[in-house]
């Protein structure tokens, strides 16, 4: 082998101008070593340089020869990367310019479209323009076809888009017939509970296209100019056309059979062909042809809609015919009672019956009068000699009715007064007025004069003057400046009020009860309240029945009447009376007062209408009502959660504990449920409305046929939530309240009758006796009772209604104003499952309970407090009832006392809450908590009797009852335990061995929203969790993978639940 140095030198490519280009394109892989020699130091042949700026060279080559090393290659890579980045930036710039250009084009298109729409709707009214804009907005497509964009607030809607069906959704209430584009609109409609079948606007969609109709020849014109040209052409003819003739604006069309309104004539024709409504409901004249859509003027449309809104309706169950007054009550009824039935809406009148108001028989053009029958038409023709036009079609009748009502200058024909005719007060009486031609005097009833001398039977007269004012008088001779004031006086004097059907709140003013319905119940059918008589404790469904009730049961303020008086004059004095009236009659006038009696000053006392305390003088009652300290009610409200408080210190502590020391105060009026931002507004409200809320109660001096026993005794004890009182002074009042309360409990399903021989139930004793006589005639024994009365909340059975009612009062009723002593500690009780016992054991146990209840009644007199009972056998919830649930939740109130306060919304239907308490904890039911009240009312909440005073007593009770329920309930029902103790994790493992889906939630690590979402998601994914548990039981070797899979599915279920919220 030769010298390796020469071989290495030969392997280096020659340097020179020809080789520079080829050297630049070469890679490191092109260098080849042709031979290997003995290892020698490379430093002998290569000069090493310490600086990166100098080029390395060999000892035997020219200075012009250069080779590329690692640094050159890195520089080439950097140059290529920079070039690639520059091209990428250029492409992004071009794309951004294209996007900006497309956005500018879109903005220009929307601007042009808006100008076009403005030009199109310029000839329409403001209402039509707004309706048209809303209609166009609803038709605009979203970001995707058939989807709704979630928007920026995607924390609860991370699933992307919500699918919307193109087909309208029909309201599930029969005869409601309202359709909605999506489920959100349907849900709002169901909560408002506006299912009136008498609604002509359910088919009134889209914008109105107005036309103008002539009431003489019934021709229609598209524009007003065409109508004016028509009047100008017909002015010469003597047929009623003149330049001052106003047109009727046609905005919609009505079906001649059902009188539903449509925006377009084509839609009405399509409806008539689909429903076969080609025959008319009202036949006028000899017109027997095919019916056509009726042109409906704007005046008739507004009047028909207003009259239909005043038609009362009810939603009933088709099976039991029970009246359902709210969406919550409807849902609970069909989930608990009539599962296979449905609701139906029934109205007192149909749309056709309301539209009969527009049907006329004749019209007089000379005096602009309409006639509803042929008799009045003929009488007018004979008396006046006018030519009366006979109406031959429904369309002519509607047009002439609107023309006569709008053209008549009489105020009584105005639309508002036409609507007020249906709202005429039933307490008003019409007094006859006789005029004397000689003196032009007005007869005044003698009771109005308030004369002391009753020996004169003549009629007093006052000289008529030009200026006459209307005055309203009550039967008690008080004078009022307006009809509203006297009607309010009659209502207050007869203790009439307004009662909310949903929550039972009673108000004295109709405006306050409507505001209460709107704010508290979300506007759920604003008329969902009744008239309530405090004296008789009677509900009146309609205002028309008030007159009959007041006349029959009340006295002194049964009606009011209207009289015309000379302005500036008082009642008849000695100078204005007739000769048969002596000068000793009073000359003073009856002043207009609301809170004081007449000038005769009868004996009596002043009563505060808030607390019903009596006072001897008006000054005392005024000072009492003016003082805020006289009445105890909520005055402050938390601006975060709207929870009311009595004291501001309590509100401060609440904000520090619940809202991270962020104090926001609002002022709350607990008397009428109004909220104010500043204290001055609250004080002004109290001074204007509640500081004068007192009335004078006169003492009856005349002889009465009633005895002392007939006068009611005022009970002063605390009132329960069912309407009864905690204790009674008078046995008559106790008997009346108990009988009324028992009937209400049976009607509302809080108590019911159940057959002992089968599972049949009934709401009254008559139906149960009929069932036993017809079905169990052979088995029935006359000496033995064949039925029991069951509690609707805990399903405990009793042998008589009185024992069941006492049980309900003792266990499921609370004080309306609870005291601390009411929720005192109880002694330990005995618990026993009785749902799965045999029929004989149940009878034996019921007999024992019945005998015990009789012994209790003998020891307690006129009191519902049974705190002295040393031992009581408490029945746990019925297992048959628990099998219908979809989720059982065990709550440890020792660790989570404010469980219901943390819930942001309602839990899913089928969730049963079982609460436990022990140790030194004394859990109290939350006040004014809608979620707790709803669960307690439908029987989905059970408060376990107090455990022992041990710290972990509630934990042991939860483990014991959860284990018992695990043996007897279906495995697909999940169990959830809400407690902060780590020992329950072992219970979860034990449940997995029995294939029971169970979850242990720590209240200290969860917020209210997350906790509510977890509970709802567990209820929704019952089957999925059950299948996962079955797989885990079969494959015990992959337990860790199962846990991770279950957590992922649980998070997915939580996400879906949050999307639904």
UniProtKB/Swiss-Prot annotation:
A zinc finger (C2H2-type) spans 169-195, 253-277, 315-337, 362-386, 498-521, 531-554, 606-631, 636-659, 667-690, 753-776, 789-812. SMART domains: ZnF_C2H2. Residues 30-37 are annotated as: Interaction with SUMO2 1. Pathway: Protein modification; protein sumoylation. A motif (PLRP) lies at residues 38-41. One of its GO terms (biological process) is negative regulation of transforming growth factor beta receptor signaling pathway. One of its GO terms (molecular function) is transcription regulator inhibitor activity. One of its GO terms (cellular component) is PML body. The modification Omega-N-methylarginine is found at residue 158. It comes from the Eukaryota. Residues 1050-1061 are annotated as: Important for ubiquitin binding. Its main location: nucleus. It is found in: Nucleus; Nucleus, PML body; Nucleus, Nucleoplasm. The modification Phosphoserine is found at residues 155, 432. Residues 1-344 are annotated as: Important for interaction with SUMO1 and SUMO2. Residues 1-38 are annotated as: Disordered. Disulfide bonds: none annotated. There is a cross-link at residue 706 (Glycyl lysine isopeptide (Lys-Gly) (interchain with G-Cter in SUMO1)). There is a cross-link at residues 75, 77, 106, 139, 144, 153, 167, 270, 275, 283, 288, 301, 309, 357, 423, 434, 446, 452, 454, 464, 543, 585, 632, 647, 664, 706, 731, 748, 777, 779, 790, 817, 827, 832, 843, 845, 852, 951, 992-993 (Glycyl lysine isopeptide (Lys-Gly) (interchain with G-Cter in SUMO2)). Homooligomer. Interacts (via N-terminal region) with SUMO1. Interacts (via N-terminal region) with SUMO2. Interacts simultaneously with two SUMO2 chains. Identified in a complex with SUMO2 and UBE2I/UBC9, where one ZNF451 interacts with one UBE2I/UBC9 and two SUMO2 chains, one bound to the UBE2I/UBC9 active site and the other to another region of the same UBE2I/UBC9 molecule. Interacts (via C-terminus) with ubiquitin. Interacts (via N-terminal zinc-finger domains) with SMAD4 (via MH2 domain). Interacts with SMAD2 and SMAD3. Binds UBE2I/UBC9 and two SUMO2 molecules via its N-terminus. The most N-terminal region interacts with the SUMO2 chain that is covalently bound to the UBE2I/UBC9 active site, while the second region interacts with another SUMO2 that is non-covalently associated with the same UBE2I/UBC9 chain. Belongs to the krueppel C2H2-type zinc-finger protein family. E3 SUMO-protein ligase; has a preference for SUMO2 and SUMO3 and facilitates UBE2I/UBC9-mediated sumoylation of target proteins. Plays a role in protein SUMO2 modification in response to stress caused by DNA damage and by proteasome inhibitors (in vitro). Required for MCM4 sumoylation. Has no activity with SUMO1. Preferentially transfers an additional SUMO2 chain onto the SUMO2 consensus site 'Lys-11'. Negatively regulates transcriptional activation mediated by the SMAD4 complex in response to TGF-beta signaling. Inhibits EP300-mediated acetylation of histone H3 at 'Lys-9'. This is E3 SUMO-protein ligase ZNF451. It comes from Homo sapiens (Human). The gene is ZNF451.
């Amino acid at each position: 082998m030769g010298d390796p140095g020469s071989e290495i030198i030969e392997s280096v490519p020659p340097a020179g101008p020809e080789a520079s280009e080829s050297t630049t394109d070469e890679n490191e892989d092109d260098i080849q070593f042709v031979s290997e020699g003995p290892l020698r130091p490379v430093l002998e042949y290569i000069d090493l340089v310490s600086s990166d700026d100098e080029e390395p060279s060999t000892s035997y080559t020219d200075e012009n020869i250069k080779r590329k090393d690692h640094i050159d290659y890195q520089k080439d890579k950097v140059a290529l990367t920079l070039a690639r980045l520059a091209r990428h930036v250029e492409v992004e710039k071009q794309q951004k310019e294209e996007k900006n250009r497309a956005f500018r084009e879109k903005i220009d298109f929307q601007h042009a479209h808006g100008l076009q729409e403005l030009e199109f709707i310029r000839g329409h009214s403001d209402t039509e323009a707004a309706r048209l804009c809303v209609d166009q907005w609803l038709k605009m497509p979203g970001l995707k076809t058939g989807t709704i964009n979630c928007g920026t607030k995607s924390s609860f809607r991370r699933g992307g888009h919500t699918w919307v069906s193109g087909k309208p959704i029909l309201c599930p209430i029969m005869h409601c017939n309202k359709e909605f584009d999506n489920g959100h609109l349907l849900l709002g409609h169901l909560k408002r509970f506006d299912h009136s079948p008498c609604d002509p606007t359910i088919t009134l969609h889209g914008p109105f296209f107005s036309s103008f109709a002539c009431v003489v020849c019934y021709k229609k014109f598209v524009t007003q100019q065409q109508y004016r040209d028509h009047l100008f052409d017909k002015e010469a003819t003597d047929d009623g056309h003149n330049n001052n003739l106003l047109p009727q604006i046609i905005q919609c069309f009505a079906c001649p059979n059902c009188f539903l309104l449509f925006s377009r004539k084509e839609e009405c024709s399509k409806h008539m062909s689909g429903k076969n409504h080609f025959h008319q409901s009202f036949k006028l004249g000899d017109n027997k042809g095919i019916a056509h859509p009726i042109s409906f003027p704007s005046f008739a449309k507004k009047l028909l809609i207003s009259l239909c809104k005043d038609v009362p309706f009810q939603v009933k169950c088709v099976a039991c015919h029970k009246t359902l007054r709210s969406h919550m009550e409807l849902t609970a009824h069909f989930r608990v009672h009539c599962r296979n039935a449905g609701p139906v809406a029934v109205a007192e009148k149909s749309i056709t019956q309301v539209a009969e108001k527009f049907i006329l028989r004749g019209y007089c053009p000379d005096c602009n009068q309409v006639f509803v029958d042929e008799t009045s038409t003929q009488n007018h023709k004979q008396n006046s000699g006018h030519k009366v036009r006979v109406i031959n079609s429904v369309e002519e009748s509607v047009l002439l009715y609107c023309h006569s009502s709008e053209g008549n200058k009489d105020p009584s024909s105005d639309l508002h007064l036409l609507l007020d005719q249906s709202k005429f007060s039933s307490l008003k009486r019409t007094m006859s007025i006789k005029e004397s031609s000689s003196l032009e005097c007005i007869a005044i009833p003698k009771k109005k004069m308030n004369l002391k001398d009753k020996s004169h039977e003549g009629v007093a007269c006052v000289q008529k003057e030009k200026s006459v004012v209307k005055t309203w008088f009550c039967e008690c001779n008080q004078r009022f400046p307006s009809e509203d004031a006297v009607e309010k006086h009659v209502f207050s004097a007869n203790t009439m009020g307004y009662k909310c059907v949903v929550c039972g709140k009673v108000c004295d003013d109709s405006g306050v009860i409507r505001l209460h319905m709107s704010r508290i119940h979300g506007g759920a059918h604003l008329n969902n309240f009744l008239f309530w008589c405090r004296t008789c404790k009677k509900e009146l469904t309609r205002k028309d029945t008030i007159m009959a009730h007041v006349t029959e049961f009340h006295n002194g303020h049964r009606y009011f009447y209207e009289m015309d008086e000379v302005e500036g004059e008082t009642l008849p004095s000695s100078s204005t009376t007739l000769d048969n009236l002596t000068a000793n009659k009073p000359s003073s006038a009856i002043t207009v007062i609301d809170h004081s009696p007449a000038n005769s000053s009868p004996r009596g006392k002043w009563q505060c209408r808030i607390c019903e305390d009596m006072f001897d003088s008006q000054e005392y009652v005024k000072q009492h009502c003016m003082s805020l300290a006289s009445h105890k009610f909520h005055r402050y409200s938390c601006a975060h959660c709207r929870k009311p408080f009595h004291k501001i210190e309590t509100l401060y502590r609440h904000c520090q504990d619940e809202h991270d020391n962020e104090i926001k105060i609002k002022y709350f009026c607990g008397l009428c449920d109004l909220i104010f931002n500043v204290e001055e507004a609250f004080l002004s409200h109290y001074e204007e409305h509640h500081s004068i809320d007192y009335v004078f109660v006169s003492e009856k001096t005349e002889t009465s046929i009633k005895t002392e026993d007939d006068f009611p005794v005022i009970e002063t004890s605390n009132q329960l939530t069912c309407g009864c009182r905690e204790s009674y002074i008078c046995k008559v009042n106790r008997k009346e309240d108990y009988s009324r309360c028992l009937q209400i409990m049976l009607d509302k399903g809080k108590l019911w009758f159940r057959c002992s021989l089968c599972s049949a139930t009934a709401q009254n004793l008559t139906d149960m006796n009929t069932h036993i006589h017809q079905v169990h005639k052979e088995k029935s024994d006359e000496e033995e009772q064949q039925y029991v009365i069951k509690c609707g909340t805990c399903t405990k059975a009793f042998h008589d209604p009185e024992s069941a009612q006492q049980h309900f009062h003792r266990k499921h009723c609370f004080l309306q104003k609870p005291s601390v002593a009411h929720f005192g500690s109880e002694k330990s009780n005995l618990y026993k499952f009785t749902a799965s016992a045999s029929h004989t054991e149940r009878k034996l146990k019921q007999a024992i309970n019945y005998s015990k209840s009789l012994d209790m009644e003998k020891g307690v007199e006129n009191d519902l407090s049974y705190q002295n009972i040393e031992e009581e056998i408490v029945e746990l919830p019925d297992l048959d009832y628990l099998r219908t649930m979809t989720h059982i939740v065990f709550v440890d109130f020792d660790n989570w006392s404010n469980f219901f306060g943390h819930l942001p919304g309602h839990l899913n239907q089928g969730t049963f809450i079982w609460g436990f308490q022990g140790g030194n904890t004394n859990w109290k039911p939350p006040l004014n908590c809608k979620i707790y009240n709803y669960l307690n009312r439908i029987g989905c909440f059970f408060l376990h009797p107090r455990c022992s005073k041990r710290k972990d007593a509630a934990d042991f009770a939860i483990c014991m009852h959860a284990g018992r329920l695990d043996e007897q309930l279906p495995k697909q029902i999940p169990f959830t335990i809400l407690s902060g103790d780590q020992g329950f994790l072992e219970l979860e493992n034990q449940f997995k061995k029995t294939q029971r889906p169970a979850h242990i939630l720590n209240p200290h690590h969860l917020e209210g929203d997350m906790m509510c979402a977890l509970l709802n998601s567990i209820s929704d994914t019952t089957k999925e969790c059950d299948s996962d548990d079955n797989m885990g039981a079969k494959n015990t070797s992959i337990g860790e993978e199962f846990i991770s899979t279950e957590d992922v599915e649980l998070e997915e279920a939580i996400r879906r639940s949050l999307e639904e919220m």
